[in-house]
Regions:
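Conserved catalytic cores of phosphodiester-cleaving nucleases, focusing on short active-site segments
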Residues: 15, 58-76, 87
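A short acidic/basic microdomain associated with nuclease active sites
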Residues: 34-50
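Solvent-exposed, charged helical/coil patches
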Residues: 1-37, 95, 107-108, 112-116
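Acidic pyrophosphate-coordinating catalytic loop
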Residues: 48-51, 106-108
Length: 116
């Protein structure tokens, strides 16, 4: 089962209307059940002129290769895509998935793959 299939399964089983955190936790359960290595809530420092000036928190990093960023909003937008690209730049990883579990009935999970 791949990341996209897992996300679809989560949304089918849980349905809409939960917080991003609930879907995040469900992804952790699914990854553990499948024996897939992941890190949750990795702190990613932001550097400027040799100084750490802040940080971002990556939702999940799978197999030290793929960033997963979860949302529970109406639809993915440019700001979310920029956030995903920032994660790739700051981590040096090549792939991120933006996964949105939109509220409301009759919706589908929205997945956008970003590559560096």
């Amino acid at each position: 089962m791949n990341i996209e299939q897992i996300a679809h399964e989560i949304y089918i089983l849980l349905g809409p209307g939960y917080s991003e955190r609930v879907y995040h936790n469900a992804m952790e359960v699914s990854l553990r059940e499948l024996g897939i290595h992941y890190e949750s809530e990795r702190i990613v420092p932001i550097h400027f002129k040799g100084h750490i000036i802040g940080n971002l928190r990556a939702d999940i990093i799978v197999n030290k290769e793929i960033v997963l960023e979860f949302k529970a909003i109406k639809t993915l937008n440019e700001a979310v895509e920029v956030q995903g690209r920032n994660y790739l730049q700051l981590t040096g990883l090549q792939t991120a998935y933006l996964i949105n579990f939109p509220p409301g009935p009759g919706r589908e999970v929205e997945i956008q793959k970003i590559t560096a």
